[in-house]
Structure formats: C-alpha cells, structure tokens
Amino acid sequence: MKGLLDLFKQFTPDEHFDAIKIGLASPEKIRSWSFGEVKKPETINYRTFKPERDGLFCAKIFGPIKDYECLCGKYKRLKHRGVICEKCGVEVTQTKVRRDRMGHIDLAAPCAHIWFLKSLPSRLGLVLDMTLRDIERVLYFEAYVVTDPGMTPLKKFSIMTEDDYDTKKREFGDEFVALMGAEGIKQLLQEMDLDTEIDKLRNDMTGSELKVKKNSKRLKVMEAFKKSGIKPNWMVMDVLPVLPPDLRPLVPLDGGRFATSDLNDLYRRVINRNNRLARLLELKAPEIIVRNEKRMLQEAVDSLLDNGRRGKAMTGANKRALKSLADMIKGKSGRFRQNLLGKRVDYSGRSVITVGPYLKLHQCGLPKLMALELFKPFIFSRLEAMGIASTIKQAKKEVESGTPVVWDILEEVIKEHPVMLNRAPTLHRLGIQAFEPVLIEGKAIQLHPLVCSAFNADFDGDQMAVHVPLSIEAQMEARTLMLASNNVLFPASGEPSIVPSQDVVLGLYYATRERTNGLGEGMIFSDVVEVQRALDNKVVEITARISVRLTEWLRPEDGSDNFEPHTSLIHTTVGRALLSEILPKGLPFSVMNKALKKKEISRLINTAFRKCGLKATVVFADKLLQSGFRLATRAGISIAIDDMLVPKQKQMLIERAENEVKEIEQQYVSGLVTAGERYNKVVDIWGKTGDEVGKVMMSQLSKQKVIDRNGKEVDQESFNSIYMMADSGARGSAAQIRQLAGMRGLMAKPDGSIIETPITANFREGLNVLQYFISTHGARKGLADTALKTANSGYLTRRLVDVTQDLVVIEDDCGTDNGMAMRALVEGGEVIESLRDRILGRVTAIDVTHPETQEVLVLAGKMLDEDTMEVLEAAGVDEVKVRTSLTCDTRFGICAKCYGRDLGRGGLVNQGEAVGVIAAQSIGEPGTQLTMRTFHIGGAASRAAVASSVDAKSDGIIGFNSTMRYVTNAKGELVVISRSGEIIITDPHGRERERHKVPYGAILNVKPDQTLKAGTILGNWDPLTRPIITEFAGHTRFENVEEGVTVAKQVDEVTGLSTLVVIDPKRRGSAKVVRPQVKLLDVNGQEVKIPGTDHSVTIGFPIGALIQVRDGQDVMPGEVLARIPVEGQKTRDITGGLPRVAELFEARTPKDKGILAEVTGTVSFGKETKGKVRLQITDPEGKVYEELVPKEKNIVVHEGQVVNKGESIIDGPADPQDILRLLGVEELARYIVDEVQDVYRLQGVKINDKHIEVIVRQMLRRVQITNPGDSHYILGEQVERSELFGTNDKLRAQDKLPATYSDVLLGITKASLSTDSFISAASFQETTRVLTEAAIMGKRDELRGLKENVIVGRLIPAGTGMAYHQARKAKDELDDNERRLIAMQEAQEALAAVDADMADSAGNAAE
C-alpha cells in the first residue's frame, strides 16, 4: 500500500541554487503569478463555513479546502486528480496548494508603493528629483503636477495648487496637461528616459559639494534601475498581489466567532474601496467624490503594505493597530528572526540538572523516562527488526507497557549515540556540547562538574535542554567535534575550560600545603605505597614534610613517545606524593610539588595539554576531580565565626583617620581648602584607612606562629579556614574577607557618588541600623545594574555576530608578507601583557633573528608555539612581526596563516572554521561581567591617577623617545617641555626593558645614556597643578592682562597673598575677545624670536591659570610662568565597561574629541575669531593647514613647535576616524585592540587580541572610491573591499585603469547593514529600508555568509558544510562537462543512425 501511495506523490526535483535575486515586480509578472482576480471582500460563509466565490478565500482561485475534493462534492478521491469541476470551478488537487497560489486585485486607479515613497531617502523623490513633500501632495490629491507643458511657459514636474490649476486652465486651455494622484506620478515615471538622465548626471558632476553629492545619489539610483532592468514606473502599482489564504488564515472559534489574520481586514478594506471607486468611475461621478475615493484607496494600499508608515495606523475593532505585510517580516517576532533564524527543534527535552561526580568527562546522566521518549523511533525500529512487534502501532503499545525487553533495547540504542546538552543563554560555542548518555533513575539530568564553567551552570535549579542528533553524519559531527572531552580549551583565550572549582580546589590545596612540624615530619619512604600505608595508620599526616623515592616518566631528548623513567629521592609532602600517582606520563613531578591553588591547577592542566596531548589531559582532569572531592571530604574544612579575626590595630587606625578628617574640616572652615577638595581628601583618607585595616587583617589571618622540630617559634602560612578558601581561589576574595573581619569601608550613593562617612564596622561585629541602610543602596543598584547589563551585553553580541558572520577561513595561505610588529605592552613601567602572551599561536611574517648574533631563530610562515617562544625569550627578542587578520589578502574570507592558532583546539586553524562568529562570541560572552557605569574622576577612583614621581623597576641605561624635549633651568635641573615625552630604559644589549610617560613640566633626575640601578627615581612633578613653562630666557611683557577684563585678583583669606587668575571670557565685561599672554624681550628690548623663524615667542595663559610671574620680571628657561590647578579642570567622565566597548566597536566620535595634526609641520597661531583660536600648521612645502579651536579646549602644542602628522595637538579622547585617516590601518587596529583590552583587563577577563582584530577587519571591509578609473563605480561610492580588488584585477588584465580607493571605518551596526548580502542585512535591522534598496538595485545575494544560508535552509558554508558546498560546485562543473560529452555522443550516434538508414534505403532501392 505504501508503495502505491508513493506513486501518487508529486515529485519535486531537488532544487540547487547559488544565489537569490530580489527585484520589483512588473504588473505582468504579478498577473502571471496570480490564479484569478479577487473581486469581492467576502471571506467565508458563516453558516456553511465554505469560502465565498471570488472572495478572499475563494476555492476556485486558491485551491480546494479538502484534499482531492472539489467544493460542491461532485469529484472526490484520487482518481479525479487534476480535474476542474464544471459546477464550482475548483481543481481537484491537494489542499496545500492554498499555501502557494496567489491571487490579484486589479486596481481601478494606480497606487504608489509606500516603501519607495516614504523609506528615506525617498526613491520616488530621487528619480523624479522632487521633494517628498511635493510628491505626497500630488499622491494624496492636494496638488497637481504638470506632466506635459505643451507650448506654455509652465515647467514639467512643477507643482500647482487647485486654484493655480484653474487660473492656468482658463489662461492656456488644453495646451498643457497636469494630473493629480498616482496617475500623474506614473505618467512622469513612464516618460523618463534613463539613459539621457544618466548621461546628463554624469556630465553634471561639478559645482558645489552639495550638488555633486545630490547628483551622485540620483545617479546611483538611476544606474541601479538601468542595470537591473527594472522600470521606474513599477514603483506605482496597477495590480496588487494577494497573499495565499493559508498564510493569512481565518479560524472558526467555538461560539460562532472567528479569529482572523489582520491581513484579511486590510485586504477587505482595499477591495471595498477599489470596488466602490470602480462603480463611481462607471457612473461618471463628480470629480471631487472620485478624488476622495482614490485617496482612500491609496491609503488602504499603504496600510496593507506598511501600516502606520504614513498618517495614523489603521486599527481593528479593538483599537489595536493592524499588522501589515511589512510588520510580518520585521522585528524580533517577524519572519526573519522568529521563524527563519530561530526554529524549534524536534527530539528534544529539558530538565533540571544535578551533579554527576562519578561520570567521566564525556558522559552525562540521562533520566530513563526522558531517554525512552527521545529515542522512541529507534526503539520502534529495533522492536520491528527483532520481530517483537509487526507494526508501529504494536511497537507503541509495547513501549507504553514498559516491558523489560524495551529497557534492554533502550540500553542498546543509546550505546555510542551521543546527545547534545545546551544551557541557555548560549553565549559561546561551549554552551552546547555533546555527551554519551548514561541511563539513570530519577528525573534530573546529571552533568559532569568540570564542564560547569563552560556552560556557566550551577546546581541551584538550572535547567538544560537535550537534543538528539539523528543522522549518522550528525552523530559523527557530535562525536568528533562537539564531544565534551574534545573541547577542553576556551576559544576566547586558549586557557583550559575544564578547571576544577570550589570544593575540589580546596581539597587539592589542603592536601598539597606544608605544615611545619607536622606528624611524621622528616620521614623517608621508599615509594608512594609506603606513604599511603603510613597515612592509613596515622603515622604521618597529609600535610607533613617528608622525603620519598619517586619515578618520573619524562619524554626523551628526541621528542618521541617512548617515555624514560627517572627515579630520585624528592623532598615533598605526603599529600603531594600521593597525588603524584595521577600525574600523566611526560610531566615532571616539579609541576605538582607546590601548593595547588586554582591558578596553579589551571596552569597544570594547560601544561599537560601542551605536553601530553588531549587524551592524557582529560583522564588527568577526571582523576584530579575525584581526588579533589575525596580530599576535601577528608580535610573537613569548616567555617566558624572565630575564623574571622578582627585585627587589634583596627580601632587605632580608625581613630587616626577620624582625627585627620577633623583637621581637614578645620582647614575648610578657615578657608584653606575648597568644598570639593575637602570632600576629595576625606574620601581619600577613608579609602586609605580601609585599605590599611584590610592589610593588617590579612597579615594577621595569613600567618600563624608555631613551634618547629627544634623547639623554635616560627611563622608559617595559616591554616585558617577562611584564609585557605580565599588563598586557594576556591571561594571568596580578599575584598570579601575585608568586609567580614576588617571594615566595610566607603559606600556609594545611587547616583554613583561616594558617601564620605564610611561603614567602620564589619560583619563579624555587626552593622547598626544606619550602616545597614547605607549599604542597601549599593546592593540594590547592583541588582538593577545586572538586569540592564544582560540586555545590553546580548545586543552587543548580536551586533558583533552580525558583522562577522560571513568571515570563514577559506584557504591555507594568502601569501602576503605584511603583518604587524608586536611588542610587550608596557604601561607606567609595568609589563601589562608580555610579548609571549601577545604572539603565542601567531604565524611569523618575516624571519625572526637573534638580536646579537643575527642568526635566524624562526623562519617566516612558522607558527609560534610554546617551545619556540622559550627559544625567543632566551634570546631576548623584544619585537616580532607577525601575520594578522587585518593584513590578510584573502578575498571573501581569511586564510589560516594570517589567523594563526585555533585557540579552542591548540593547532593551526582548519579551513572552514567560522572565525568571525567565534570572535564575536569571545568578545560578547564576558560582556555580562563588565560594568555598566561611567566613572567620575574624583574621590576613590582618582587615587590611581595621582602619581607624582616615577621610578625605575630594573637596572639599565636611560634613553628618551623621539618627541622628548627638555630645557635646563636656573638650578641646573632638566625640565620636560614636550607633551608626549617618554623615558625608555634599555638593557646593555639595547633591548627595551620599560618605558615611562613623563608629563609636561616634570623635573628629570636622570640624563640620557646614564646607567642606573632599579628603584632610582627618574623624575617628579606636582600632580595637582599643570604648569606653563618658558623655553627661552628674557624680560616678560604682559599683553591683555587687565584686571577685571581678562584676569581677576584673588586674595587668599588666610594668608592675605594675592594672585592673578585668568577668567572665562564669557563672564568678562567687554565684548572684545582678547587672550591674555606674555611676550619675552631681549636685552635690547626686541621681542625674542623662535630660532629659525620670524615668529615671536608668545605664551598664552589659559582660563583658570594662576599667573606666577610679574610683568617686567626676568625669567630663565624652564621657569614656571603660570599654574593651572587640576581641580579647576572639568572632571572628565570616563566611559567604562560595556558602553566603552560598544562605543569603540561602533566607531563613534567621542564628545570633546582630541584633534590630531593633519600634516607634519610647524605650529603657529593666526588671528582669533569669535571665541576661537586659529591654529596653523605650515608644512615643509609652505602649505598652511588651519584649524579653528574653541578657547576652552586645551591646546597641547605651542608656537614654533614641530609636530608630526597624526600627533595630538588638542587634548581629548582620540577619534578612530582620525587615526585611520592620518596614521593608517595598523595604528587604528592597535588603538582599538588596546582600548578594548583595557576594559576587559580591568575585570580580569582574558581575550586574545586576534578576536578583536577580526572585528576590526570587518569594520574596515568597505572602501570608498576616490577615482573610479575605467570601472563602473561612481566617485564616493562605498564598495566591498574584496569585490573592488576583483574588479581591479579584471581591469588590469585588460590594461585598463583600475579604481583607487581610501579606507573607510564603519561601526559594527553600519557595517552589518552595508554588507553585500541583503538577506543578512534585512534580518539584522531596518528590514524595510534594506529590502527597498535591494529591490530597486535588483540585488543578487550570493549566499556567501552563514546567516543567509541558514535563512534559505541550506548547509552553512563553514566547517563540514564548506566541504559539502565545494564538493557540490565541483560536481556541478563535472556534470556540465559530462552532459556536453553525452550530447556530443548522442549527436554522433544520431548521425551514424541517419547514415545507416540512408544506406539501408539505398540498398532497398537497389533491390
């Protein structure tokens, strides 16, 4: 029977397609889709439930209601398939054709498509060169448009009101034609000749910038119409397609009411108005009535296409705006994001998770009931195969009765069939992993404790979902790629993800600690077995120091896998000796012969992975886990209130602080300090005190006095439970212990400002009511913050994924030798990130040579692994040029060499790896750990910023960077006068050890090439004021320094001294803008000139400066002329955390941005205009570049200074666009990478640089055409980089002029929307705008990215899917060739047959 039914299945050939095209439908096209015209607004007959004929659900147009049965019931059954009933006109076929048969409505008057009218920029407006307002007035019958001026002076395209029209009609009669409504617009569009318009525009690309911009926009649209073969008048519709009825269903509810899709209401409105208009036209009704009806029809069509886009949205009976066709596809619940990108999955279940401590890493516990349900089909087929059940129905019964044989079969079916576990939210690829199921009783899924950190799961009620991979291919991929034991590293950083936490760490830590004078200290054992026996018999304790003979299995010199035993007597402790049993072969015991804190365990697992491989590591991790649980139980570590030791010095410290605060209050009352300073100082004092109490408490907790074997009292590390928990990294931190036993310290108000009275109590002593109340602020803000953070972080991840989703490794090597020079990241003299961390797992771009002997250490094109890094570190290499994804030349993808190591697997990245998505996940996943706040500099936050000196961390030789300039003052001290000076300390070989920024005005204590010892102070400065220093000697002459106009005298109330302060010009009496400044005169009274120029030395005083010299005083170089108190500077908010990362990736221009020098040259100041300073830079050719700078900006250059292109001339945060324009791609990448890393580093999150580089590559993927050459591009057009390179290659091959371009930096949202794939862009944001644009251009989506392929339901072109697509392409080419061959053969055979026939007939004739 089944075979018979298969015969009747309608065969649909497998459709292979390589691209999807979108366009505007012509009226003919719409009619060709249609199966009939919908003439009536009726839907279904409410009594018979049958669809009305010619209505919106008409069976004649759209197909039958029941399978193979016409409406009147004359033809039933399969045998009449394809018959059209003569009575009711319905074709006898399957009912599912009602999902794809369309109808149409012939509109009685043309209607404009609202998308092309209202979606900005208005396409209709661009084509017609009319304003949107004018077009709307014409369309909605408020004005006439002239379509044919005839012999009259009227202009075509001009607009006239009704009164104008009447006057002109009287004046000119029928000489001209002016129309109203969509007819007029359609007429104009029809008469438009694209070719002439394009030529006109191409020749008219001169004149003002605005005109050129406007013309190039129009040109782009016109070219698009011409290229795609779409006629502009199709933007006005004569025929409206009708959606198939099953896609806008009408469902009868009980009680005789109906639930209907909003579209039916909208269609009914259109049909009603259309029919009424047709009737009015037939009756030749008065113009005004017809006009109103036409307007209403246009509005109805607008609402159907995009409700609410113009005017008020149409509403249904319940005052709710109706969902139009546009609403169906856009937004989170639209077609794209709800149904195409997010589908529900069959064969899945979910349940609560619990711990499975006895599981192996690749296993999970699956409840029997769940497994039975999930694997049902497999069980049915086994039952049938074994002959226990003959039909599926019988098998069902068997399973439901739960006979023992069913459970046996379940065991069998489940064996070696991996299942996938997922925990929402799935923030990175480790959120879904495959496990082998183990059947368990109960109803909770059991999860291996080591994978918790990857899933971010805990057992406080979390739920997880189970999915069953069905096909053999799916099972294979789950096993080889997704099995938990194959994913032991985080793809974000390459750190191990299977690191034990909490009690396991505590157990291992306790067992590997040493105790002075422990039971059995100093004993010597022959092997581990003996140690175990001694422990069991309580002769030794687990923390005692002993010596034991151990055998280590080490890898031989030649690196082969034949491990050699090395036996020796080792000093260690009992616990460590016992743990040595589980050490994998190839690791020396020294890696374990220390107290195992969490970091150490992580390092241990990492070392094991690099040295012993994956399998050994997984086994080792499992054993560590078992040991950790067992030892933690044995240790019996508990927590008690007496473990929280409050230091005795606490009271004294607090009293001291209170006295200091009193002193400052006194100073404030006497007017020595301002209110702001008082607040800052008080907060500072309490902050310091809190830290001191914390320090004292920790030192008390962490040490304890014990008697050693010789009877002496010694300090040993404490065995205090709370200290051990924090020290091992199991739970808690120093800050939390400080709140338990130190003092809670300062609290913040809800607005983020710090309350200046701290909580001096701790939790052990208990808080009073006021203290408790103060601390509730912070706690609640924390909860509110978390909720906001999650949403924001999710949105950032979504944007990142969208911008990188089509970046896949598609070839092994692009052959470029470009790269980026990497060196250790040093800030404030401290190495923040070593060279090793930055280049590990990268591929060298050029040979790396030994700094002294110049021998080649690493060849170009080699991946730097751990062993190579040791060689480089030994040689002291401090800079390596490595390949990076930014300089990769691969088109439409990236190559493996430029990407480097796949961090999640530890080898060179495979072809087909979706590195873009991995980068996005790696940056997005820790997003929830970042803060949401913006920090105010002030109070506790600023303490880090106030350094007043800098000292050397290592011995070496002093050098200065190229921009460092200094003068010697009267005392013989060196005073820094450059803004970006840095001191560099190098070792004797000339390798950089550290570099320190020194601010303007600092006094240097060292000279160039001086050799110094670590700890020497290099320079010091006053952190609270910014000085203004003269570089030249001379006699001062003040200009514009007038009291009450530009300066005010401030008299200090206490000391009675007076100083001049420069005041803000906004508050001055006079309207004239003058800038107070000082000039220097030489002995002859002439103005001192800057050497080599004829500019006088002029030093301006900024607002808020305290002038330190008198008029007419003699000054020496390096002397301070004025000081600006830092307090007077506006405290800049630092954007931190998540908003900062988003700001960087969106490439937003910061507010109050710094300005960089556009050219290299000499600085001078021109004459001032309206509150702005004219800053000029003269380049070596003598060209002058000008920048107008508002007065209140802080200019960091001075007259006569030579600046390099891209150097900062005005203080403030850098604008990434400027960095790209002036300094290039590499500097930009460096800036973004460093800034993003700063944010994550603050939270202690490790992310590899390459992920951020991948995102930057995608932000730079479009270029702007600066000269089109012989290409078809338009000046200023933005094009995909890969596409442009392809075009240029073709042009060069034909000896034509290639197009030139400049780099463009787009923010991630912009970049996602401007991709070449319209499907991907439409499913991201602004669906309407993207589709409108794509339709006009007749865009073709090549389906290159992952998203497009998911949407159209193909395998994604990444991973195993990439191989599939490549194979398919190859097969298609083969097939084509084969077809040609076969065709040729057939032709030859046919010819031969003809010849034979002719020979035959000739023979017959002869006979």
Curated annotation (Swiss-Prot):
E.C. no: 2.7.7.6
Example of a GO biological process term: DNA-templated transcription
Catalytic reaction equation(s): RNA(n) + a ribonucleoside 5'-triphosphate = RNA(n+1) + diphosphate
Cofactor binding: number and manner: Binds 1 Mg(2+) ion per subunit. Binds 2 Zn(2+) ions per subunit.
Key words, A-Z: DNA-directed RNA polymerase, Magnesium, Metal-binding, Nucleotidyltransferase, Transcription, Transferase, Zinc
Keyword Nucleotidyltransferase: yes
Cofactor: Mg(2+); Zn(2+)
Entry's transmembrane regions: none
Binding site for Zn(2+) 1: 70, 72, 85, 88
Family: Belongs to the RNA polymerase beta' chain family.
NCBIfam families: rpoC_TIGR (TIGR02386)
Known partners and oligomeric status: The RNAP catalytic core consists of 2 alpha, 1 beta, 1 beta' and 1 omega subunit. When a sigma factor is associated with the core the holoenzyme is formed, which can initiate transcription.
Name under which the protein is recorded: DNA-directed RNA polymerase subunit beta'
Organism: Leptothrix cholodnii (strain ATCC 51168 / LMG 8142 / SP-6)
